Amino acid sequence: RTLLANEIFIFSSEYGKKGVEDTNAVRLKNQLTKTEDVKTLRNYNIWTGKGNIAEADLDSDETRELADDFLNETGLEWGRSQHGGRSHRGFTVLDLTKKNTRHAYTFRDNPDDTTIIELRAHNHYTMCGGKYDDGDTAIFNKADKPSEITWAQLHKQIGMLGVAATMLRKARISDPHNEFYKYMAGALKQHKLTYEDAEKIFDAVIAHHGHCKRSERMAQLKSVYNAEVTEQTGLPTIVKQWNWSELEKDDFKKLLYVITGRHSLPAATNDFVKRIAYMMKQKKF
């Protein structure tokens, strides 16, 4: 009842099967308009974009673990029962437009499903009740009013969460830890993150990693951010020392660009900036 009162568009689909093949006409026909029409052997889905609803889809263990550190609290949480109904978070986006559709972010460190987080709005849907084709069920953890946010704010939070999740995954398998955190600090500065954003990422990762002293790691971060540019060591060192693939490097950079807004620049802009920086270092500009 609360969901319908908040103008969240819910439609039913075949039980035990994702409604991805349903046409928009079918979804409109199957819209749920009153709670009395809810049936037990049906799946139920939220049509994102409708009513300015967007969702954060937490596809990896690390993004689910860290979500509360980065995403605004909201009254709308749902997902698989095995994830406690918290793997999807819904928000009302105040400035949502038709061009705000879907952004999916991966970390390709394995041959399986590598998507770690998604931001979805127009032209997409998300299952919120019923049974998946693998037998798991979808449940609500909260079914109240979604909190309000702007698209840019939510997208940045998605980027921050994705970077922190990737960093946490790698921190757990990268020794020595002190060097990993030092070079990661360099990577964040290298990609123009503010100290405040870098500090928030470090804080969350350190708290969940649990194998190092916060004071030591934060001192490293501050030292790197206070250092001259010529003294920096960042992502290239991480890639080399811990054998990251080019795919892993590209995925991580994509998330870093979301935080600073560089993801919205034309595709050639980042290469142009790199060329200018190189020329400046060579004193040719």
List the model feature ranges, each with a label.
Residues 185-204, 239-285:
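N-terminal nucleic-acid engagement/recognition segments and initiation subdomains in replication
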Residues 40-42, 169-180, 192-197:
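Structural motif
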Residues 1-165:
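Conserved phosphate/metal-binding and DNA-contacting active-site motifs used
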Residues 2, 6, 130, 182-191, ...:
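Short, hydrophobic/amphipathic alpha-helical patches that form generic packing surfaces
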Residues 215-249:
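Long, compositionally biased
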Residues 163, 179-183:
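Alpha-helix N-cap/N′ positions at the starts of helices
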Residues 203-218:
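Short, mixed-charge aromatic SLiMs
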Residues 156-172, 262-270:
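Intrinsic-disorder/low-complexity linker and hinge segments
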